[in-house]
């Protein structure tokens, strides 16, 4: 399992929580952004800096995330692409995006975008607080536990364990144990 983070607008507290989860689970967390982002120094955390163009980080995540991974993003359009690829995705407030709720979320996003474009709604984002961090941490724990259970079931069926671990150079290697 790889934890993918759309790091361009990800709160620092969320980055720390993801880094701790990656260390606890022994997996890799890839923070993808089109500019350098400060990270927790850990062999489990990898910064992926894309070209400094719009949507480059999103395209990278879409191209490399796989079933069994978890993506963290607040970008609804990216979340829809990830859900459509049958990959688990949550936002930085702990909301889990699914096939059942992503269309509604995208519709609300588009409606609010239109209202803001017409000057009928202010551009506001509530500050990220302790409750948000706790809710995110709970959601992250639930989703990673679910993904680990699914991976164990697949391993039991195939008899092979797939793992993704960081090498000494900090790059990820995939192999069989």
UniProtKB/Swiss-Prot annotation:
Pfam families: DUF188. It comes from the Bacteria. Residues 155-177 are annotated as: Disordered. InterPro entries: UPF0178. Belongs to the UPF0178 family. This is UPF0178 protein TP_0845. It comes from Treponema pallidum (strain Nichols).
